[in-house]
Amino acid sequence: MVKVIDIGRVVVKVLGREAGRKAVVVDIVDENYVVITGPKPITGVKRRRVNINHIEPTDKKIDIKRGASDDEVAKAIEAAGLVEYMRERVKPSFVGITKAETK
């Protein structure tokens, strides 16, 4: 299955300490990594590079340009009326082998 990950796509982190939080893709580094931001005041996710296997795309997308600043992303989220949607945390649905299954 090919993930639809493009600039402005709202994603959910499925692994790591920020699992279950939503973020926005602001840049595509290569076929394995993207740069995301919450921005931190809205979702608690700070701007960072993440592996695409650690995020799950949603059907929502906001209109931003590549490399947009956190302020520009926050304004675009407010303009799209997605502030409450972005603040909601979801239970990540990571499908893979867990440590318990390897024993």
Swiss-Prot record:
This is Large ribosomal subunit protein eL14. It comes from the Archaea. GO terms for biological process: ribosomal large subunit biogenesis; translation. InterPro entries: Rib_uL2_dom2 (IPR014722), Ribosomal_eL14 (IPR039660), Ribosomal_eL14_arc (IPR023651), Ribosomal_eL14_KOW (IPR041985), Translation_prot_SH3-like_sf (IPR008991). HAMAP family: Ribosomal_eL14 (MF_00721). Keywords: Ribonucleoprotein, Ribosomal protein. Belongs to the eukaryotic ribosomal protein eL14 family. GO terms for molecular function: RNA binding; structural constituent of ribosome.
